[in-house]
Design a protein with these regions (language model features):
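Acidic donor-binding segment of Leloir-type glycosyltransferases
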Residues: 2-28
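Short beta-strand-to-loop acidic/aromatic patch adjacent to the donor-nucleotide binding site
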Residues: 51-60
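Non-catalytic, C-terminal membrane-associated alpha-helical segments of glycosyltransferases
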Residues: 199-229
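A short, conserved alpha-helix in the catalytic core of glycosyltransferases
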Residues: 121, 125, 131-164
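Conserved donor NDP-sugar-binding/catalytic core segment of glycosyltransferases
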Residues: 66-99
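Glycine-rich, basic loop-to-helix element that forms the pyrophosphate-binding segment
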Residues: 29-46
Length: 229
């Protein structure tokens, strides 16, 4: 279903010998420059090759059978596609909500993996913010395209299996607590970038930004009290 696959490798090792295929374009960065930079590298490669759409994937996700083909067919037949900045599948995780009954829903933000982004709109919003490095990069991009008047469509008949990593479920005052067990550095980026989102978009999306701020404080508390260090 893909014309070309860009493999952006942000490890410090050149793994090109494993990707000798005409449909692969392997791009070694030879250091971890952050998820936002890696996404921009792939997007600019696609733009240089005159592609209109880019599928973004994480290493911990996979589409269910024929899902990508179905997603492409739905997009091709969507009369609103020129104003849709992101088409997203339904992300199936250990903690995901029930699948909506509608074909399309319009979440305010979506996770990166499995998205098909409109590259004309990507250029309009000037891509992903590289100074964020990791965490909230995808949410910032979603808010940015919405601030510019574009939309996000989640296709609820297309499923992506997404692993959440080393999470645990614990209980506090009869309440279920999800602990993600991130490193201290990763926790720093989560909290820092959550507050950046608040500063950048509170005027446009106040309810969401207040929730992000609360969640950042809550996750820091859970990490301090419940997670192993």
């Amino acid at each position: 279903e893909l014309d070309v696959l860009y493999l952006v490798d942000n490890s410090n090792v050149d793994n090109s010998k494993f990707f000798l295929n005409d449909k692969f374009e392997y791009i070694p960065l030879l250091k971890n420059t952050g998820i936002a930079h890696a996404l921009n590298v792939g997007a600019k490669k696609a733009l240089d090759s005159n592609y209109k759409y880019l599928l973004t994937m994480d290493q911990d996700s996979k589409f269910e059978s024929d899902a990508l083909k179905n997603m492409k067919n739905i997009i091709d037949n969507d009369i609103d596609k020129d104003t849709v900045g992101i088409y997203s599948p339904f992300h199936k995780t250990a903690i995901s909500d029930p699948v909506p009954s509608e074909l399309f829903t319009s979440p305010l933000v979506v996770m990166t993996s499995g998205n098909i982004i409109n590259l004309d709109i990507y250029k309009c919003v000037e891509g992903f913010k590289e100074w964020m490095f990791i965490d909230c990069v995808d949410f910032e991009y979603g808010l940015n395209i919405r601030k510019h008047g574009y939309t996000i469509k989640q296709i609820n008949t297309v499923f992506l299996d997404h692993e959440l990593g080393n999470y645990e479920i614990k209980y506090f005052l009869n309440k279920k607590i999800f602990c993600d067990n991130h490193s201290a550095l990763r926790r720093y980026y989560i909290v820092r970038n959550s507050f950046y989102l608040y500063d950048l978009y509170h005027d446009d999306f106040p309810d969401y930004c207040e929730a992000v701020k609360r969640q950042a404080k809550q996750s820091f508390f859970y990490a301090t009290v419940f997670e192993k260090h």
